[in-house]
Amino acid sequence: MPAVNQIELHPYFQQKELVALHKEHGITTQAWSPIGGITSYRDSAKRSFDDPVILAIGEKYGTSAAQVMLRWHIQNGVQVIPKSTKAERITENFDVFDFELTAEEIAQIDALDTGVRGGPEPEVITLEAFGRDIPEA
């Protein structure tokens, strides 16, 4: 039984059944692509960064869309590993503990779930497809 399962998880792809299974078995859920940057890769017309619901919540608290999404994860008990190469965004990603989303705001974000993965399907993530040999540690 794993202690942690790292999965694609963001407002547009919430994997609620899997997260519930993790909780049932004491497995920590860790979200990669927690702010939905991956949502722009599948020719989607919608991007979580531009979602009006998320932007409106951010405006209320004076925060970015990314901060709203990170806070949503934290309040749902999910570990997050956001990616950024920009120092100001890395700092911003840590600045999510001075506000709290209401139950209504969490429900609004929960309602954004499309069930559509942004990243590749797990079965296509193979050595042949990605061409990287990862040696034993």
Model-inferred region functions:
Residues 1-137:
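Beta/alpha (TIM)-barrel catalytic core signal, keyed to glycine-rich beta->alpha loops juxtaposed to Asp/Glu
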